[in-house]
């Protein structure tokens, strides 16, 4: 899913590069939006540290039980407390690319970092092909993404049966402290999402466009309600396009370029959530990530969010991969499954709202109509 979605998005740039300044402004704003969102989320998790509400004895027991990745990570950290350039290079470009992605054995799952790099490289290489062949590659990648999305949907249909069992297992192993930790985690996530959407994005509107923030949020309220109720950026796209053209007065060329691309490449709420979950689960297991690792996490959360399918629960496979990348037991994802649906609805609102803000800002910066 990560490979197909990200590589396909890169291949599309071959068709969009002719739009020049529009594309450059859009991608710069996408990256800035998601980076700010992740940074805010990580600051919040480091400030409130919801995972620290769990007793230290419980953390030790969890590390012992899930051992493997967590224990190896703690050992590595004692030997290499700070991440250096060589470590970062090895994370992105291992000696055995296929082995790193697939996992060395049944006890070691693959890592997401080399996969992201390979997807970007393959997509960039495909851009150099002649249009007909490039289109064939893009169609193949899109088909792969659709197939993987179908598999994820099948797994998500089983979730209502699996989640109660996983929550029961978590409570038995961790105790009732987990509910306090989850409560602090949820409130922290919601607070940061509100802060980013209605404060950061309002500042963007005020400084970079001609729109009044209050009038803007009032005009797109139906779009945000649709996003919250469907938990899907893709399902909200038709409503967002209509609001952009009819209510916000955004040029059709700008709206038609920014919003569809934003449903897969401007996932601020998703990126924010990914960073928060990784730090929270790391705290639950008693694992401290260094500043260098958290900086790497910020970038990975941004790139990982780009690869997330715009469907309910689409970020869960990415989060599992991020946990593995930082040596945190992937089983820890079970801790947040019970509250994921509420936060999924909320982060979709942030994703869609930020898409419309970006389209508004890009349209204001463009000034003149972009030729078709």
Regions found by a protein language model. Give the residues of each.
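Signature of multi-pass transmembrane helix bundles
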Residues: 25-35, 39, 43-55, 59, ...
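Transmembrane alpha-helical segments and their short flanking loops
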Residues: 53, 275-372
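Short amphipathic alpha-helical coupling elements at transmembrane boundaries
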Residues: 18-25, 139-154, 215-226, 242-249, ...
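Membrane-interfacial loop-to-helix junctions in multi-pass transporters
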Residues: 108-114, 153-156, 191-192, 206-216, ...
